[in-house]
Amino acid sequence: MSRMAEQQLYIHGGYTSATSGRTFETINPANGNVLATVQAAGREDVDRAVKSAQQGQKIWAAMTAMERSRILRRAVDILRERNDELAKLETLDTGKAYSETSTVDIVTGADVLEYYAGLIPALEGSQIPLRETSFVYTRREPLGVVAGIGAWNYPIQIALWKSAPALAAGNAMIFKPSEVTPLTALKLAEIYSEAGLPDGVFNVLPGVGAETGQYLTDHPGIAKVSFTGGVASGKKVMANSAASSLKEVTMELGGKSPLIVFDDADLDLAADITMMANFFSSGQVCTNGTRVFVPTKCKAAFEQKILARVERIRAGDVFDPQTNFGPLVSFPHRDNVLRYIAKGIEEGARVLCGGDVLKGDSFDNGAWVAPTVFTDCSDDMTIVREEIFGPVMSILTYESEDEVIRRANDTDYGLAAGIVTADLNLAHRVIHQLEAGICWINTWGESPAEMPVGGYKHSGIGRENGVMTLQSYTQVKSIQVEMAKFQSIF
């Protein structure tokens, strides 16, 4: 693909040049080619976007619930019509295989938008009788202008997960995509405008997180920040949001999730689940189950089943329908993952497979890392303690149920957890003791629109998806009505 035209900001229904004068490049990680130069939003651009959003939000919130619902449903239709085009752009920008982006990223994002479009008319207050002459009623009102700050691993899906409930509740959103993968968020802005969203209700500001993101979290005109990213960045976003104007926050942060295989499990099923929990999206999924706990007596057999399935991984041309494994999202990220692999070897973990870059003409110019499985791991190893966010699995052994629960919970993270067992009594007993916000039994990874998604401990605050997220983009106003004569004590 030839280099794209320079990408601008999207403010008030159209493209506009950044006043900052700064730019950055977005790279195709499969081959190292520059896709586009992208303009970076500065402080003045954030001010412009906030003013635009404030104007548009008043128009949007004044529309009836059904009018807003119809516009969002129209956007869903356009997303589905343009699925292949958007998936190709997402593949170029992220490096993910087209077989994945064409069936998951836009599809699931559109599902979430459709879900919230359907919930809009059900967003209602309540009536509370006090006595014969007085009652209270409540209204759920939009927050106003909110900010979404996205991660690089699911660019358009995250933009939809954040914008769908925000817009459904009557807010306007200013969205800052990751500077690593900014392209499809701009296309989403076009689609919202085409669907009839009033100008300013969805503005997109590409830029560097440490600058553009901080301008958003500092801005007094922003009522809430929804952030997806790492724990360290999340803490800064939360601190800035509180210090500036006590903004509400939703944080979807990192994870180091446990996947527990019990001794009664079908090992073929367990191996299939483990592969998806570690190597889907080349391991760049925040919920990945990278700490795989296996009974000691099952370890050897389980390892053989994993190795057999690693042979089925097909890396190569990311647009080949048979490819199911792409490069990492960037060269700096690849280098960071390789440092973790080297650390695992240094600390005594045994490499079962992988452990290096992929080599060959198809891989030499890209950010490719081989699917890597470590075994003979211990809980104190760096690769077991820290989030790697790449195709790196750690196999650990255990002897008892109590032991594995304790070790699974021995982490600052609490995003996800899963177990594989034929005993549903055991499944529920263990799941109820695991300290994680998203749990799976005999499956892994699905996050439907109806399912609240978020973490315990350092893995996040608040939830995305589900009914409660729509409510989190509103504020409750309580109104008391008195029909009898008011009595004053003065």
From Swiss-Prot:
Task: Kindly list the positions annotated as binding K(+) 1.
Answer: T26, I27, D93, V180
Cofactor binding, per record: Binds 2 potassium ions per subunit.
Annotated binding of NAD(+), by residue: G150, A151, W152, K176, P177, S178, E179, G230, V231, A232, S233, G254, C286, E387
Q: Where is this site: Seems to be a necessary countercharge to the potassium cations?
A: E248
Q: Could you confirm whether the keyword Transmembrane helix appears in this record?
A: no
EC number(s) from the headed UniProt entry: 1.2.1.8
**Keyword Oxidoreductase annotated:** yes
Residues that, per the record, bind K(+) 2: L246, K457, G460
Pfam families annotated for this entry? Answer: Aldedh (PF00171)
Q: Which CDD domains match?
A: ALDH_F9_TMBADH
Molecular function, one GO term: metal ion binding
Q: Which residues carry this modification: Cysteine sulfenic acid (-SOH)?
A: C286
One record GO biological process: glycine betaine biosynthetic process from choline
Q: What cofactor is this protein dependent on?
A: K(+)
Q: Which Gene3D superfamilies match?
A: Aldehyde Dehydrogenase, Chain A, domain 1, Aldehyde Dehydrogenase, Chain A, domain 2
The active site annotation covers: K162 (charge relay system), E252 (proton acceptor), C286 (nucleophile), E464 (charge relay system)
Give the family per the record: Belongs to the aldehyde dehydrogenase family.
Q: What protein name does the entry list?
A: Betaine aldehyde dehydrogenase
Give the originating organism: Escherichia coli O45:K1 (strain S88 / ExPEC)
Q: What is the lineage of its organism?
A: Bacteria, Pseudomonadati, Pseudomonadota, Gammaproteobacteria, Enterobacterales
